Curated annotation (Swiss-Prot):
Disulfide cysteine pairs (residue numbers): none
Protein name as annotated: Ribonuclease 3
Main localization category: cytoplasm
The organism of origin for this protein: Lactococcus lactis subsp. lactis (strain IL1403)
Coiled-coil portions: none
Length: 231
């Protein structure tokens, strides 16, 4: 962790007070499984927290920066920014993958550069930063790493199928869209998810993905295309 601490200080001016917290953020579930450590020792809880912090900061930035855009447009922009591919790229740009503690099996299967793993790592780091130093530092970090790409429009042109589906269905009148994870398969370090999207209780489509977010996006895409099957 000393090399990581040095990198964070040199690149972002960050010095973690709680090194164990930082270590947890960079601990994959495959590592804790192989080492027979408690599940709470991996980064999944921090990922949950970081996901919320990231969404809040991005939402606040978009709201203040684009006063002319409607809610639907802002939602579409935010979804494009926080999607799996985008967050994985942010994680790569920070060089985080090098410091991730992985199990040997996951390492051999290329887990260190798997997009969902890097996405989760980026969110876990934000969660750890929030606990260690508060929301202001999280905001500063996101402004340094993420916001420049938003200003360059790098991540706001990607199709967000969930928002697109909502817009299509709303044309036909009142609608209640919901998503449900139908199935989880595979070991903890290499999960696959099957999601379904419903409108007013009627299933419209299913999707398969390596994360719940990806599976839901795929379900929405299949619903738009009229494909009521897993793909």
């Amino acid at each position: 962790m000393l090399k990581l601490q040095k990198k964070l200080k040199n690149d972002y001016g960050l010095v973690f007070n709680d090194e164990d917290l930082l270590k947890t953020a960079f601990t994959h579930s495959s590592f804790t499984n192989e080492e027979r450590l408690p599940k709470i020792a991996n980064n999944e809880r921090l990922e949950f927290l970081g996901d919320v912090a990231l969404s809040l900061v991005i939402s606040d930035y978009l709201y203040r920066t684009y006063p002319e855009k409607l809610e639907g447009e802002l939602s579409k922009m935010r979804s494009s920014i926080v999607r799996t591919e985008s967050l994985a790229n942010f994680s790569r740009s920070c060089g985080f993958g090098e410091f991730l503690r992985l199990g040997h099996g996951e390492e051999k299967m290329g887990g260190r550069d798997r997009e969902t793993t890097l996405e989760n790592l980026f969110e876990a780091f934000l969660g750890a930063l929030f606990i260690d130093q508060g929301m202001d530092e999280v905001r500063k970090f996101i402004q340094h790493v993420v916001i420049p790409h938003v200003k360059n429009d790098d991540y706001v042109k990607v199709i967000d199928y969930k928002t697109e589906l909502q817009e299509v269905l709303q044309i036909g009148g009142e609608t209640t869209i919901s998503y449900k994870i139908l199935k989880e398969e595979g070991p903890a370090h290499d999960r696959s998810f099957v999601a379904a999207v419903f409108n007013n209780g009627k299933e419209l489509g299913r999707g398969l993905g390596k994360s719940k977010k990806v599976a839901e996006q795929k379900a929405a895409e299949n619903a738009i295309k009229g494909q009521n099957h897993v793909s």
